[in-house]
Amino acid sequence: MKPVVVFVLGGPGAGKGTQCARIVEKYGYTHLSAGDLLRDERKRPGSQYGELIENYIKEGEIVPVEITISLLKRAMDQTMAANSQKNKFLIDGFPRNEDNLQGWNKTMDGKADVSFVLFFDCDNEICIGRCLERGKSSGRSDDNRESLEKRIHTYLQSTRPIIDLYERMGKVRRVDASKSVDEVFEKVVQIFDKEG
């Protein structure tokens, strides 16, 4: 069985992680966060990628696509090996740019089906406010204003064009993410109920 993938995109602080947790609970998807996989790999003793990942994340830059895809593929393979019924994945925070998308198409062509792109659309200032709030407790090294400005700049420059590209293919399901968590999830449920 091939993995079925929903790409989850949106700026920093759009609520991707929060909403993904709820989708997992309600629809039985497996949530893979590209960022979390990279952060975990960075901490893994003896990782061949650790230091490299650290430098990219600190600079607010996008990690080379080969690394991210190999981590995503490994996670999907492990999940499906453990339970063959679990073939539905939410991939959050990927693809971030054209290079990511080309890398995915090249590596995963015929190996995974992308059913749609879930896009959490949120005003930048709201996103920054949420991240700064989260930074007080998350301990994430990139939840500070300087890193955030860089991340939002990278997102607007690199990720928005990817969303536009999928939009033209009719694959984007857009959600207004500036509303409350419950209101946003209500809209998400409508989308998943319709898409099956």
Swiss-Prot record:
Pfam families registered for this protein in UniProt: ADK
EC class name: transferase
Cofactor(s) the protein needs: Mg(2+)
LID: annotated span: 133-143
E.C. number: 2.7.4.14, 2.7.4.6
Sites where the protein binds CMP: 100
GO molecular function terms noted in the UniProt entry: (d)CMP kinase activity; ATP binding; CMP kinase activity; dCMP kinase activity; nucleoside diphosphate kinase activity; UMP kinase activity
Keyword Metal-binding appears in the UniProt entry: no
InterPro entries: Adenylat/UMP-CMP_kin, Adenylat_kinase_CS, P-loop_NTPase, UMP_CMP_kinase
GO cellular component, one term: cytoplasm
Localisation: Nucleus; Cytoplasm
Region (NMP): 33-63
Binding-site residues, a ribonucleoside 5'-phosphate: 39, 61-63, 93-96, 140, 151
Oligomeric and partner information: Monomer.
Entry text on domains: Consists of three domains, a large central CORE domain and two small peripheral domains, NMPbind and LID, which undergo movements during catalysis. The LID domain closes over the site of phosphoryl transfer upon ATP binding. Assembling and dissambling the active center during each catalytic cycle provides an effective means to prevent ATP hydrolysis.
UniProt similarity note: Belongs to the adenylate kinase family. UMP-CMP kinase subfamily.
Protein name per its UniProtKB record: UMP-CMP kinase
Organism in which the protein naturally occurs: Gallus gallus
